[in-house]
From Swiss-Prot:
<dbReference type="InterPro" id="IPR004671">
    <property type="entry name" value="Na+/H+_antiporter_NhaB"/>
</dbReference>
<feature type="transmembrane region" description="Helical">
    <location>
        <begin position="66"/>
        <end position="86"/>
    </location>
</feature>
<dbReference type="Pfam" id="PF06450">
    <property type="entry name" value="NhaB"/>
</dbReference>
<keyword id="KW-0050">Antiport</keyword>
<feature type="transmembrane region" description="Helical">
    <location>
        <begin position="304"/>
        <end position="324"/>
    </location>
</feature>
<keyword id="KW-1133">Transmembrane helix</keyword>
<comment type="function">
    <text>Na(+)/H(+) antiporter that extrudes sodium in exchange for external protons.</text>
</comment>
<keyword id="KW-1003">Cell membrane</keyword>
<keyword id="KW-0997">Cell inner membrane</keyword>
<feature type="transmembrane region" description="Helical">
    <location>
        <begin position="97"/>
        <end position="117"/>
    </location>
</feature>
<keyword id="KW-0812">Transmembrane</keyword>
<feature type="transmembrane region" description="Helical">
    <location>
        <begin position="476"/>
        <end position="496"/>
    </location>
</feature>
<keyword id="KW-0406">Ion transport</keyword>
<feature type="transmembrane region" description="Helical">
    <location>
        <begin position="448"/>
        <end position="468"/>
    </location>
</feature>
<keyword id="KW-0739">Sodium transport</keyword>
<feature type="transmembrane region" description="Helical">
    <location>
        <begin position="390"/>
        <end position="410"/>
    </location>
</feature>
<feature type="transmembrane region" description="Helical">
    <location>
        <begin position="139"/>
        <end position="159"/>
    </location>
</feature>
């Protein structure tokens, strides 16, 4: 039967995506202008829900195409303007540079990372200890690096482990070329492969949550932390001290949760590393040690020195994250002899599709701003006072961060609270407490879904996700125990008065000083 033009069009539209998904996207594109004509506010929330749907279906179709079509239509029908979209991208330029340069920079440090984490996996046989190591090390790194950078590190390590095992299990030697994305090798043991996938899923989720545990603690841990610190005129040490009444108990609760889910093997955790896989990784480690030349050792040393620069540069905020990432690329390639353009290009393959997706997301953010979708929630939260207001802001931030980008949510709320301060609705001390509630509210409950945490979304849409069968639903399920524990411990630290009491203690012991409203007015308004 000959293929008609209409059939060919439908076949080409969104490629190999399921037919029902194609029909759903077309339906959205037809419905949205009609709803917008009658009620722009409802149409705005409908668009947000539809975009979240495209993210949820990331393994059926990469969200850039369906989400991008929705965003283009939103601009075309007047839900927002091209200038507003450009403004959002400009305001978040540091995040864009982070994705373009920092993630690529980590690519050139993967030899060192694979060396360190391979030792960790091969030398520590207890799954519980390995899980705790991954969670704690991710938290530590995230206190100095952006969570996206840390998750890029862990993804690099996981892909390295997976490709090594897949190559050897397929009957090849370490040095041979191999396509680890194909399972069409008869030598592969399906049960063994599934167990290894489960093991890697566990480690990636523990590491992902670790980035949230560490990222909330310091002003460089997450992009929105920088925004909040700038608005409040806080420096690195003051930010960490002010957050500590909430972040310290939450950190220990998170580590305890990591131990418990592994111990009792619930929520998809407790997957063991098969002995055969451990032997392959151990053999690879021994093979690498035996064949490591002086040139290789110098490369590892150079990468270690660059790693020190990376942490120091970010901790001291010597330059923007993206520019430090660019310096990592230049230093790592120059001193390790990588001068071929094709070799350089490979480093950017992982991050650029996600960077384009993030730009589409900023278009959705522009709609949220222009249609004032969060305005009712903000006014409701400001109607409360005192400690109750802190709890309400924490919960309101948490709920919105579960479905929307936490950088955007944090930016919107801190700007609204700052306006309330400058208008005399709240005191400066209350503003400082609210800033803590906003920061912890955007960072902690947002681990619930990949929509809130950019690092989680990056993981979901990365090359490793389909290899280890990490879907949106599975991610939400595995994050659930962490979501419950972190959210509850965080809200209790505020509700029971620990935040107010400890902050007062810090004032009394002169670890903190009282700021004036004018100091906040002098803060730099930013949204990156």
């Amino acid at each position: 039967m000959p293929v008609t033009m209409s059939r060919a069009f439908l076949d080409n539209f969104l490629g190999n995506s399921p037919k029902w998904f194609k029909i759903a996207i077309i339906s959205f594109l037809v419905i949205n202008p009609i709803v917008f004509y009658f009620n722009p506010f409802v149409a705005g929330w409908l668009l947000v829900v539809e975009f979240i749907f495209t993210l949820a279906m990331a393994l059926k179709c990469y969200p850039l195409q369906p989400g991008g079509l929705l965003a283009i239509e939103a601009v075309a029908i007047g839900m927002t303007s091209p200038s507003q979209v450009l403004h959002e991208i400009e305001a978040n330029l540091e995040v864009v540079l982070l994705l373009v340069f920092m993630v690529a920079g980590i690519y050139f440090m993967k030899q060192l990372l694979l060396f360190v984490f391979t030792k960790m996996i091969t030398k520590v046989r207890s799954k519980i200890y390995v899980s705790l190591l991954f969670c704690i090390s991710s938290a530590f790194l995230s206190a100095f690096l952006d969570a996206l950078t840390v998750i890029a590190v862990i993804i690099t390590v996981a892909v390295g482990f997976y490709s090594i095992y897949h190559k050897v299990a397929s009957g090849k030697t370490f040095g041979e070329s191999h396509d680890h994305t194909s399972d069409g090798y008869p030598q592969l043991c399906e049960e063994e492969l599934e167990s290894f996938r489960g093991f890697l899923r566990n480690l990636l989720m523990h590491a992902g949550v670790g980035t949230a545990l560490g990222g909330v603690c310091t002003m460089v841990g997450e992009p929105q932390n920088l925004i909040i610190a700038a608005q409040a005129n806080w420096q690195f040490a003051e930010f960490a001290i002010r957050m500590s009444p909430v972040t310290v108990p939450v950190f220990f609760a998170g580590i305890t949760t990591c131990f418990l889910v592994e111990k009792f093997k619930v929520f998809g955790y407790g997957q063991q590393l098969p002995d055969a896989v451990h032997k392959i990784l151990s053999d690879y480690d021994a093979h690498e040690d035996a064949n490591r030349t002086k040139h290789d050792k110098v490369k590892l040393l150079i990468q270690a020195v660059i790693g020190v620069w990376l942490i120091a540069g970010l901790a001291l905020h010597l330059a923007s994250v993206g520019l430090i990432g660019l310096s990592v690329i230049i230093l790592a390639t120059a001193f390790n002899g990588i001068t071929n353009e094709h070799a350089l290009g490979k480093a950017f393959e992982e991050a650029l599709p996600f960077t384009a997706l993030l730009a589409v997301f900023f278009a959705i953010v522009a709609v949220i701003i222009d249609q004032q979708l969060f305005a009712p929630v903000i006014q409701w939260a400001l109607s409360y006072e005192g400690n109750t207001q802190l709890v309400i802001f924490y919960i309101a931030n948490g709920l919105l961060s579960m479905v929307s980008d936490n950088v955007f949510v944090g930016t919107v709320y801190i700007n609204e609270v700052k306006s309330a301060l400058l208008n005399g609705q709240i005191t400066r001390d209350q503003f400082d407490l609210l800033a803590v509630a906003i920061n912890t509210g955007t960072n902690l409950p947002s681990v619930a879904t990949p929509n809130g945490q950019a690092a989680f979304l990056f993981l979901l849409t990365s090359a490793i996700a389909p290899l280890i069968r990490l879907s949106y639903g599975r991610m939400v399920w595995m994050a659930l125990p962490y979501t419950i524990v972190l959210s509850i411990v965080g809200v209790l630290a505020i509700q029971l008065g620990a935040l107010e009491q400890m902050t007062q203690y810090f004032y009394d012991s002169q670890m903190l000083i009282h700021h004036s409203a004018q100091a906040a007015a002098d803060g730099v308004v930013s949204s990156h």
